[in-house]
UniProtKB/Swiss-Prot annotation:
Hexamer; dimer of trimers. This is Homogentisate 1,2-dioxygenase. It catalyses: homogentisate + O2 = 4-maleylacetoacetate + H(+). Its cofactor is Fe cation. Keywords: Dioxygenase, Iron, Metal-binding, Oxidoreductase, Phenylalanine catabolism, Tyrosine catabolism. It holds the Pfam family HgmA_N. It comes from Burkholderia cenocepacia (strain ATCC BAA-245 / DSM 16553 / LMG 16656 / NCTC 13227 / J2315 / CF5610) (Burkholderia cepacia (strain J2315)). GO terms for cellular component: cytoplasm. The lineage of its organism: Bacteria, Pseudomonadati, Pseudomonadota, Betaproteobacteria, Burkholderiales. GO terms for molecular function: homogentisate 1,2-dioxygenase activity; iron ion binding. Homogentisate binds at residues 356, 377. Involved in the catabolism of homogentisate (2,5-dihydroxyphenylacetate or 2,5-OH-PhAc), a central intermediate in the degradation of phenylalanine and tyrosine. Catalyzes the oxidative ring cleavage of the aromatic ring of homogentisate to yield maleylacetoacetate. The active site is at 298 (proton acceptor). It is an enzyme of class 1 (oxidoreductase).
């Protein structure tokens, strides 16, 4: 199977999360019984791509063997990229990262560009924490683009990219094969994997969480049991597909938050076969098996956890990816929307579709909000008043929605861009100012 981004993919996918996959685009391209034969089939080169340390425990060890037309080392030297440099990877105090305010923050959607702009040039960092160089924390980017990548390819050496499209499909051609991703789906591109993005719908906008630390994994289910939340079989990895093209191409690398470019005389998407457990994947959020209360109270949002990146502290993650999908609410004598909250963790939210059930106005698809450690948040005044008098003897379906959250153990620091942009809603705090005083010590 060869790569062709001009039309939808026809190849199927490999099912399962972090499975040991094996796939070949030409029969017999995978060596039999060994990884690095003296001569690989079809004159290919054997190359290992390691996503974890060689000595990581077997259950956490992630690597793949690629059989490609040319090794990844074949390109000209990198030089600083002359295009937009709007990415940040170090979140200590700097010109790019001013002091973090304790205010609740909310943004309108990133505008679509006027000039032709592809996926790489459409990236901008909104917030993050930790350090790409130290391999801990994350960066949260937005993208807005209106042109497919043309004869250029991209990879991030800083972290794995969790991509959440909000508008427009993405045809993502990678070294491992192709992912077609639409809104309501996510894609994860591992650290170091080279790829190109085509925009079949013209305009595209979305969110990215770049994970600098331990790889994303499925959470343990505990008392939920052996099934529920995001089921492993619904994660899809591409089958091998390649292109054998020569010409004047550009390879763009992201390292320590900076973009670099190199000339390359061939397409780096030339992997004819591969096997291993370190590969891109996608997941349809509409397949999430939502858990909730059928008696009383609103459980903690951890019941909506899709993926997590673990820290060195048991039970505390560096990143939690949480969604708020369509679901039934059945709890009686209960305030059904998400409750008022202050959190030791920090929460960056986005909205793919519809409305979020804790906010009646102002939080729109493509927009974002940030509630940092111990900043009070959740229902606005209108939502509280309506939910306080609603009939809870009948189930209610929250429909036509898809919100999500990147939650982190450490402070999420907005960038200078995020604090200065015209999309920042200066009046966000007003949504709570109409909350009334109902207290009456004479009436219980």
């Amino acid at each position: 199977m060869t790569l062709d981004l001009s039309k939808p993919a026809t190849a199927g996918y490999l099912s399962g999360f972090a499975n040991e996959f094996a796939t070949e685009a030409l029969p017999g391209a995978l060596p039999h019984g060994r990884n690095s034969p003296q001569r690989a089939p079809y004159g290919l080169y054997a190359e290992q791509l390691s996503g974890t340390a060689f000595t990581a425990p077997r259950g956490h060890n992630r690597r793949s063997w690629l059989y490609r037309i040319r090794p990844a080392a074949v390109h000209r030297p990198f030089e600083p990229y002359a295009g937009a440099q709007r990415l940040v990877s170090e979140f200590g105090d700097s010109a790019d990262v001013p002091p973090t305010p304790p205010n609740q923050l909310r943004w309108d959607p990133l505008p679509m560009p006027v000039e032709p702009t592809d996926f790489v040039d459409g990236l901008v960092t909104m917030a993050g924490n930790g350090s790409a160089a130290a391999m801990n924390g994350c960066a949260i980017h937005l993208y807005a683009a209106n042109r497919s990548m043309q004869d250029r390819f991209f990879y991030s050496a800083d972290g794995e990219l969790l991509i959440v499209p909000q508008q427009g499909r993405l045809f993502i051609a990678t070294e491992f094969g192709r992912l077609d991703v639409e809104p309501f789906e996510i894609a994860v591109i591992p650290r170091g994997v080279r790829f190109a993005v085509a925009l079949p719908d013209g305009d595209a906008r979305g969110y990215i969480c770049e994970n600098f630390g331990a790889l994303l994994r499925l959470p343990d289910l505990g008392p939920i049991g052996s099934n529920g939340l995001a089921n492993p079989r619904d994660f899809l990895t591409p089958q091998a597909a390649y292109e054998d093209r020569e010409g004047a191409f550009e390879l763009i690398a992201k390292l320590n938050g900076r973009l670099w470019r190199a000339d390359i005389g061939h397409s780096p998407l030339d992997v004819v076969a591969w096997h291993g457990n370190y590969a891109p994947y996608k997941y349809d959020l509409r397949l999430f098996n939502t858990i909730g209360s059928i008696s009383f109270d609103h459980p903690d949002p951890s019941i909506f956890l899709v993926l997590q990146a673990q820290s060195d502290t048991p039970g505390v993650d560096t990143i939690d990816f949480v969604i708020f999908p369509p679901r039934w609410l059945a709890a009686e004598d209960t305030f059904r929307p998400p409750w008022f909250h202050r959190n030791v963790a920090s929460e960056f939210m986005g909205l793919v579709h519809g409305a979020y059930d804790a906010k009646a106005e102002g939080f729109v698809p493509g927009g974002a909000s940030l509630h940092n450690c111990m900043s009070g948040h959740r229902p606005d005044a209108d939502t509280f008043e309506k939910a306080s008098v609603s009939d809870t003897t009948k189930p209610h379906k929250v429909d036509a929605t898809m919100a999500f959250m990147f939650e982190t153990r450490t402070l999420i620091r907005p960038t200078r861009y995020a604090l200065d942009t015209a999309q920042l809603q200066a009046d966000y705090f007003e949504c709570w100012q109409g909350i009334k005083k109902h207290f009456n010590p004479e009436q219980r």
